[in-house]
């Protein structure tokens, strides 16, 4: 009898490590869903804000996957459901976020992000993103602290300055290059005139053609004037 008890006790001791390994592996399988989100997000009144949330699951995405976003105002323990997803998007139709929450993710890429349109100062608070993808249902729930502020004069000024740099600097560079080129050309002409530079046959021909053209224009103007005078005299008689 004592020998039998010792044998059973030995088997129990031998099975304990095996059971421990199975429990640990099972826990790893259940807890393999990981969710990540920005801890702090800053936005401006009236400008759309994106709240990013990504997840990694060991299981394939199916129609059983669910996503839930909640909101908690500052200095409050009350939470408000603002978005639900299961094969389709279901943004809230009540409360302060009514008609302002839109889907900005892709579950097949592990993206569970949403966007807030026309944010106000009243939207400040804490947002949470919860994802369940059976059998992966246990996971961490990351929190995102949203801070909405008015755009200050400094921010607007920086935007104007950036626009000025992008528009006016290239134009200024082009103008400077043209002025430098014109200056070099004028300097070259002065040096040639001082050193007794003689024009080539092509340059002389161009000047001659220009003079002939000017003479022709002068003659044409004189001829037109004579015709007008003759017509005037005939009408007088």
UniProtKB/Swiss-Prot annotation:
One annotated GO biological process: hair cycle
Glycosylation sites: 124
Cystine pairs: 53-129
Signal sequence range: 1-32
Alphabetical UniProt keywords: Cell adhesion, Disease variant, Disulfide bond, Glycoprotein, Immunoglobulin domain, Membrane, Signal, Transmembrane, Transmembrane helix
Domain spans labelled Ig-like V-type: 33-149
Record-level GO cellular component terms: membrane
Cytoplasmic-facing ranges: 181-237
Pfam families (UniProt xref): V-set
Main localization, broad class: membrane
Reported tissue expression: Present in all tissues tested, including the skin. Present in the keratinocytes and sebocytes in the skin (at protein level).
InterPro entries found in the cross-reference section: Ig-like_dom, Ig-like_dom_sf, Ig-like_fold, Ig_sub, Ig_V-set, Myelin_P0-rel
Transmembrane segments: 160-180
Bilayer topology annotation: Single-pass type I membrane protein
Membrane-side (Extracellular) residue stretches: 33-159
Cell location: Membrane
Clinical note on disease: Defects in Mpzl3 are the cause of rough coat (rc) phenotype, an autosomal-recessive mutation, arose spontaneously in C57BL/6J mice. Rc mice develop severe skin and hair abnormalities, including cyclic and progressive hair loss and sebaceous gland hypertrophy.
Assigned protein family: Belongs to the myelin P0 protein family.
Function noted in UniProt: Mediates homophilic cell-cell adhesion.
Protein name: Myelin protein zero-like protein 3
Annotated source species: Mus musculus (Mouse)
Lineage: Eukaryota, Metazoa, Chordata, Craniata, Vertebrata
């Amino acid at each position: 009898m004592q020998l039998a008890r010792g044998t059973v006790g030995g088997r129990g001791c031998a099975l304990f490590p095996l059971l421990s390994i199975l429990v640990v592996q099972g826990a790893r399988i259940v807890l393999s869903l990981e969710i990540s989100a920005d801890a702090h997000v800053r936005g401006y009144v009236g400008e759309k804000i994106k709240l990013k949330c990504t997840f990694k699951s060991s299981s394939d995405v199916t129609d059983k996957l669910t996503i839930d976003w909640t909101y908690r105002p500052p200095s409050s323990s009350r939470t408000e459901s603002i978005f639900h997803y299961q094969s389709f998007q279901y943004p809230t139709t009540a409360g302060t976020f009514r008609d302002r929450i839109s889907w900005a993710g892709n579950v097949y890429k592990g993206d569970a992000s949403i966007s807030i349109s026309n944010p106000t100062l009243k939207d400040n608070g804490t947002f949470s993103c919860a994802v369940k993808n059976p059998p992966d249902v246990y996971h961490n729930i990351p929190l995102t602290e949203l801070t909405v502020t008015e755009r200050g004069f400094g921010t607007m000024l920086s935007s104007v300055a950036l626009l000025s740099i992008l528009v006016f600097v290239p134009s200024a560079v082009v103008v400077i290059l043209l002025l430098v080129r014109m200056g070099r050309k004028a300097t070259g002409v002065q040096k040639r005139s001082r050193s007794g530079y003689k024009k080539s046959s092509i340059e002389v021909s161009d000047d001659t053609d220009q003079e002939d053209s000017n003479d022709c224009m002068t003659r044409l103007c004189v001829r037109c004037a004579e015709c007008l005078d003759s017509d005037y005299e005939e009408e007088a008689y």
